[in-house]
């Protein structure tokens, strides 16, 4: 091996000499750049392996007039290298220096005009893993990173190419990039050395680099901590094994922007906030501040009664005519185009904000005067009109203005005075409204961090290659209200955590919602929380729980679940679980029976009518029947007068198949806007009364199940290849609930859809982002404000010839029901749940001991003794359900491996 390595390095040196190449060595890597500007080689000197791809790429390039000009020649001129870029008329001088651990490429001078971008360095690399945030490609053996040495360097990955660019709008001359090419186990050590050598941000917590600190491994509770509830919240946090409590921005302050202390929650003002943090510190807990980077609330003093001039505008024009204080139409001298987040537009004229519902060219129509607490007043022709940039219903600070610094001073000042230990920069991605996101996303984050005088655990959304340095870890996105387990595996771990892993940034698996029962989602249950806890242990990742004190108190199983989470957290931090066991826990579902002992477990839910029979599959050995059985609402039959008609096709409505260019899954085939009158529908749908009465948003809170009558024609398909139609409810805030119909039948059929199919959304039908965001179908949903029914294809076999027509869609009325003396039987035994259970109540039994009966929020109603229950044999089992009176239940069979 040593002989082969020596020959490889010698051959590289010979080739370099022949081609008049320039060779740059660190202790572990050798970069060779040809005199024609091509990056010819990057070798791992420890084993002689080439790290560049076979196709040759110039080591640098410029963009001018939209065209890329690769470096075409490089020559040494004293201590510098002079680089020419083809026929661009541009050249540049570089200083390239090598140290034991890294190379530094510095742009010392640019000759020529019209430069739009200079790629200080670019390498087409072979390692498989791509960290596009940090500009690093890596595998288990070797890592290659182009790390900018200032905020003005844009490191990124495009396909296989790692590059670092500078732009004239920020700064070019004097900018530097470090090439870190090292064995992967040494990568973070070298990064820390680069941070020290070039005085880059390199925060520590308790003297340890923040990313490797104990704090970065600990979990936190994200909740509404106040003066009044501090003791209770601390108790819950300690119960769950949390080391931090993160306070919502809306809890500690009243509005975004100037962030006044919320006197309702902290009657003693800033002193009260400090006293709560001091109390947490005394209890061994640290406290984090949640804020929303650069957003300014419409109720904030920076907006009302007089808007700050530093609010960001995304378009400006001038008033074409005089207007008085009552006119609701403005005529501008020129049109502004459409705002990024659509109509309506908020515009500021002098010191008045007008909320204009429509625009027509240069006209602003249906304007509400004196909006957001400003005063309506007359304005003269020629007055400047500025359209206020909006994101998520709030305004933004112009990060080029003094307002940005004022906000940063406010936040850092509060941190320093009251003793926060953590900051969560939420909404950072919205700062792309100011300009290129790679730069502007991190600007205010850095201002705040730089002015804070405390060790801070930094997290947030919207990370850049530069703010990577101050972030201690990442967060794996918001919580899902439904399909919690699938959301964790298919999104949080597969997408978000993979992103952070690829970029060498630790991650925690939050946020997980800790919820109480509402019409759109059930209360959080112990098996959902244990699913998170198991993955937390498997991946050695912290978790954050997002909730509020009301939900913690409402969920009757909070104590049980938090104690379980705390036990898992202690086990994880102890390092007692062997790596081989943790690797097993990363897949499937598991249950801890005692500390450190885990068994595979399945929770298989299905609806069942009482009286009736269902089949249960036990994939493990023989065992006692374990179950959760919940009373569901009784559904009216299709055609019942209490049902709500959503769609009636006269004649049946053809659901057109996807076109050749349509992107799947989730392409929209038809849409019914329920809030519009029949005559305003842009389709052949007949919705509601045939007289064309005005439509309205529907309250389906008690009509959440759907019935659809379909006519399906075409060749039969295998069930795995069958077409799947999505009857999607849309709420007024563009959130959704997906109801899937597998078109495995032919002919006419009425299909009942008792609940959404959220568990299939990510596992089978992740929608194309151009159709709709999957998050909008799994987050909270307002059944009380349903505005549309969308028909979407989630799967459609190409050239299948399938035709589908819809004749009727109804939302079925729900009626409360009650069950008494529920019996579950197999051939060998019967178990009885004595007493009554009403809609939403559920009974849970784990094969021995007592049966516990809970309300929908997990509040224990009673505990009843259980007789010897049925046994499940390995394989298929028939279970019979009986009770006093008919009803529908959801039975969850719980099976475990011994």
Feature locations, PLM:
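Extended, low-complexity, turn-rich repeat/linker tracts enriched in Gly/Pro/Ser/Thr and Asp/Glu
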Residues: 112-114, 633-638, 698-700, 711-721, ...
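Carbohydrate-recognition beta-sandwich/jelly-roll modules
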Residues: 24-245, 267, 279, 283-287, ...
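Carbohydrate-binding surfaces of carbohydrate-active enzymes
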Residues: 276-291, 295-297, 311-316, 535, ...
């Amino acid at each position: 091996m040593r002989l082969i390595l020596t020959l490889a390095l010698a051959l590289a040196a010979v080739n370099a000499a022949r081609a008049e190449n320039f060779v740059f060595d660190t202790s572990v890597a050798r970069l060779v750049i040809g005199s024609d500007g091509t990056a010819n080689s990057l070798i791992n000197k420890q084993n002689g392996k080439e790290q560049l791809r076979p196709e040759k790429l110039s080591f640098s390039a410029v963009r001018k007039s939209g065209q890329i000009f690769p470096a075409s020649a490089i020559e040494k001129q004293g201590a510098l290298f002079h680089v020419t870029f083809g026929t661009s008329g541009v050249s540049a001088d570089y200083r390239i220096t090598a140290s034991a651990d890294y190379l530094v490429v510095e742009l010392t001078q640019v000759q020529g005009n019209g430069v739009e971008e200079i790629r200080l360095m670019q390498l087409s690399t072979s390692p498989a893993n791509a960290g596009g945030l940090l500009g690093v490609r890596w595998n288990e053996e070797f890592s290659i990173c182009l790390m900018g040495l200032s905020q003005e360097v844009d490191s990124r990955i495009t396909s296989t190419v790692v590059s670092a660019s500078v732009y004239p709008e920020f700064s070019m001359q004097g900018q530097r990039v470090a090439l870190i090419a090292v064995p992967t186990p040494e990568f973070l050590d070298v990064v820390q050395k680069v941070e020290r050598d070039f005085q880059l941000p390199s925060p520590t917590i308790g003297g340890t680099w923040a990313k490797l600190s104990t704090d970065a491994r600990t979990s936190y509770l994200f909740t509404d901590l106040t003066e009044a509830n501090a003791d209770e919240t601390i108790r819950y946090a300690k119960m769950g094994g949390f080391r931090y409590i993160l306070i919502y921005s809306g809890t500690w302050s009243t509005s975004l922007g100037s962030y006044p202390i919320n006197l309702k929650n902290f009657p003693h003002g800033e002193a009260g906030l400090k006293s709560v943090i001091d109390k947490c510190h005394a209890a061994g807990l640290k406290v984090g501040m949640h804020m929303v980077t650069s957003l300014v609330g419409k109720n904030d003093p920076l907006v009302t009664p007089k808007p700050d001039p530093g609010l960001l505008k995304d378009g400006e024009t001038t008033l074409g005519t005089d207007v008085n204080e009552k006119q609701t139409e403005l005529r501008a001298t020129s049109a502004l185009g459409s705002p990024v987040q659509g109509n309506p537009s908020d515009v500021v004229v002098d010191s008045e904000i007008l909320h204009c519902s429509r625009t027509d060219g240069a006209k602003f129509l249906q304007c509400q005067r004196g909006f957001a607490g400003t005063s309506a007043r007359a304005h003269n022709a020629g007055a400047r009109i500025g359209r206020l940039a909006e994101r998520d219903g709030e305004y933004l600070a112009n990060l080029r203005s003094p307002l940005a610094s004022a906000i940063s001073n406010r936040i850092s000042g509060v941190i320093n005075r009251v003793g926060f230990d953590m900051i969560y920069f939420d909404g950072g991605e919205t700062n792309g409204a100011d300009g290129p996101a790679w730069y502007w996303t991190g600007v205010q984050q850095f201002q705040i961090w730089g002015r804070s005088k405390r060790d801070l655990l930094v997290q947030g959304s919207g990370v850049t290659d530069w703010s990577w340095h101050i972030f201690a870890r990442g967060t794996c996105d918001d919580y899902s209200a439904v399909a919690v387990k699938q959301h964790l595996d298919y999104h949080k771990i597969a997408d978000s955590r993979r992103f952070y892993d690829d970029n060498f940034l630790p991650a925690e698996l939050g946020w997980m919602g800790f919820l109480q029962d509402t019409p759109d989602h059930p209360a959080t249950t112990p098996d959902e929380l244990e699913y998170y806890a198991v993955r937390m242990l498997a991946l050695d990742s912290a978790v954050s729980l997002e909730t509020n004190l009301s939900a913690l108190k409402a969920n009757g199983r909070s104590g049980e679940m938090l104690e379980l989470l705390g036990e898992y957290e202690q086990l994880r931090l102890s390092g007692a679980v062997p790596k081989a066991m943790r690797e097993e826990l990363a897949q499937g579902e598991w249950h801890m029976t005692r500390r450190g002992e885990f068994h595979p477990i399945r929770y298989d839910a299905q609806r069942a009518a009482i009286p009736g029979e269902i089949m249960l599959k036990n994939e493990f050995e023989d065992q006692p029947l374990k179950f959760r059985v919940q009373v569901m609402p009784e559904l009216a039959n299709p055609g019942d007068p209490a049902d709500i008609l959503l769609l009636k096709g006269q004649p049946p409505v053809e659901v057109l198949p996807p076109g050749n260019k349509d992107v799947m899954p989730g392409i929209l085939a038809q849409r019914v806007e329920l809030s519009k009158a029949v005559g305003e529908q842009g389709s052949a749908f007949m919705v509601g009364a045939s007289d064309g009465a005005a439509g309205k948003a529907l309250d389906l809170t008690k009509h959440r199940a759907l019935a659809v009558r379909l006519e399906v024609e075409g060749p039969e398909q295998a069930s795995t290849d069958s077409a799947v139609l999505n009857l999607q409810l849309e709420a007024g805030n563009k959130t959704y609930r997906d109801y899937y119909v597998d078109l495995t039948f032919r002919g006419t059929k009425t299909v009942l859809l008792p609940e959404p199919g959220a568990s299939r959304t990510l596992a089978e039908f992740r929608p194309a982002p151009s159709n709709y965001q999957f998050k909008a179908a799994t987050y909270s949903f307002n059944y009380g404000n349903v505005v549309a029914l969308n028909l979407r294809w989630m799967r459609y076999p190409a050239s299948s010839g399938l035709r589908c027509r819809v004749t009727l869609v109804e939302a079925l009325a729900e009626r409360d029901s009650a069950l008494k003396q529920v019996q579950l039987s197999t051939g060998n035994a019967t178990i009885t749940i004595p007493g009554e259970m009403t809609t939403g109540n559920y009974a849970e039994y784990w094969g021995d001991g007592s049966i516990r009966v809970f309300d929908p929020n997990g509040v224990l109603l009673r505990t009843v003794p259980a007789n010897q229950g049925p046994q499940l044999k390995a394989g298929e089992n028939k279970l019979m359900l009986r009770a006093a009176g008919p009803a529908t239940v959801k039975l969850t069979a719980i099976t475990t491996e011994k």
